[in-house]
Each structure stands twice: as structure tokens, then as C-alpha cells.
Regions:
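An N-terminal structural lobe/cap that precedes and organizes the functional/catalytic core
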Residues: 1-80
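Internal, well-ordered alpha/beta segment that forms a basic, Gly-enriched binding/recognition surface
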Residues: 49-125
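General structural signal for secondary-structure boundaries
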Residues: 22, 34, 67-70, 91-97, ...
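C-terminal, charged low-complexity interaction regions
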Residues: 127-226
Length: 226
């Protein structure tokens, strides 16, 4: 039996009545950033700019239309990551990379979704057609397909399509450092205890190149603990 996989980048479909991940009609919503993360680090009311700096949102206002099964799947994932976060670096580092990809990818794609909606609305006001280059359509469509693996039978064969590194990090306070790049699909995240860097669509190239550096970081942590 064939499965129809939703690709919003084929016809640039980003309407609020369709689930961002599966394309199902829905009235449900989920936050771009995990609620527990916004509450713990108190950035729900902070502001974030779109890439061209002309549009500003509150983090807490960023919502994605989603089907119930997608919302449930991400809530389960959030709980897994929240429990690992409480226990610290070693527990987070031991998580399956696929789970780390889904957790980081949800935020990066969420911001990409808002960039697409904003750009579409901006072009409509100018009475111009919103479009993307073939290269970006393919890159974003592949990323979206990978994210669908949280609810659909998407299988990764051979080399992992991402590079993800978790490493020890020490801050002087319980703070939150975060950056993303929606065009290049990059994610950087740091808290007191560990940092996480994800290149979400590089076919594992960066992870292979930085293997020795990450191994040294992890070895240093073990030596300090002895």
C-alpha cells in the first residue's frame, strides 16, 4: 500500500487550516518552542525577528497548525527531552540521534514555516508571486520529509542525513543560549551543563570532520570527573 507524503514546498502550501507536517485539515495548534523550555528559561515574552528584521513576534505566540497525532508525538518527545535535560549532559548525550534531530528540527522548521508565511504575505501585498528557487524547494522538502518520520514510516538508509553533537558546557548561571539558521538548517543550543549543535541536512559530513574534536571534549569531561 502506497502512502501519500505531504510536501508543502511543491505548491508552497502554508495555510493555517492544514497541519504543518502532514497536511491534514486541523484546528489544533502546537508551539514552535517547547512550552517547558520557554517557562524554564523565561523567554516566552521575549521577542524574535524575522530574517529581514521587519517583522517581530513573541516566542510564545509562535504556533504551528497540527493534527492531533502530530501534537501527541511531539508532546511525548518533549517529555523525553525534558526528563533528560533534568539529569544533565550524559543523559542528553545518550539520547538517540533521531530524537535529537526531531527535537531540534521542530524549532528550526517552525521558524522556517513562519518565514514562508511572512514572505508569502509580503509578496501578496506587492501583488507579486511568492516563489523559491529549485534548490531551496528541494532542500526544505527533504528536511520536511525527514521530520515526518515522527509519525510516518520514513526510513533513513546508509549515512545519517544530519550531524548532531552534544558536548559539556559550563556557564556561570542557569542561562539559555540559542541560535538557528533556517536557510542552512543549523541549530545551536547551550545551557549550563551541555551544548548541542545540529546541522540538520549535511549527510553527516560535518560530524565526521569534527569527530576528533568532540572526542577530545568528551575525554576531558571524563578526566575531570575522576
Amino acid at each position: 500500500m502506497s502512502i501519500n507524503i505531504f510536501n508543502p514546498f511543491k505548491d508552497l502550501i502554508f495555510d493555517e487550516q492544514f497541519c504543518f507536517l502532514t497536511g491534514e485539515l486541523t484546528t489544533e495548534k502546537m508551539s514552535v518552542y517547547p512550552d517547558w523550555l520557554m517557562d524554564h528559561f523565561k523567554f516566552r515574552d521575549d521577542r524574535i525577528e524575522m530574517m529581514d528584521k521587519s517583522k517581530v513576534y513573541r516566542y510564545g505566540d509562535l504556533q504551528l497548525p497540527c493534527s492531533k497525532r502530530v501534537k501527541d508525538a511531539f508532546e511525548t518527545l518533549d517529555e523525553t527531552f525534558r526528563e533528560a535535560f533534568k539529569k544533565g549532559y550524559e543523559t542528553v548525550a545518550a539520547l538517540d540521534e533521531h530524537l535529537l534531530f526531531l527535537w531540534t528540527g521542530r524549532m528550526v522548521y517552525g521558524m522556517l514555516y513562519y518565514e514562508m508565511r511572512y514572505e508569502n504575505e509580503r509578496m501578496m501585498k506587492l501583488r507579486e508571486r511568492f516563489d523559491l528557487s529549485p534548490m531551496l524547494r528541494e532542500r526544505f522538502a527533504n528536511f520536511h520529509l525527514m521530520l515526518q518520520s515522527i509519525v510516518e514510516p520514513v526510513v533513513f538508509v546508509g549515512r545519517k542525513p544530519w550531524s548532531i553533537a552534544v558536548f559539556p558546557l559550563k556557564y556561570s548561571a542557569d542561562i539559555f543560549s540559542y541560535r538557528d539558521d533556517t536557510v542552512n538548517l543549523l541549530f545551536q543550543f547551550g545551557v549550563n551543563g551541555f551544548g548541542l549543535i545540529a546541522c540538520l541536512q549535511d549527510n553527516g559530513v560535518l560530524g565526521e570532520k569534527q569527530k576528533d574534536i568532540l572526542s577530545s571534549l568528551q575525554k576531558s569531561l571524563r578526566m575531570v570527573k575522576k
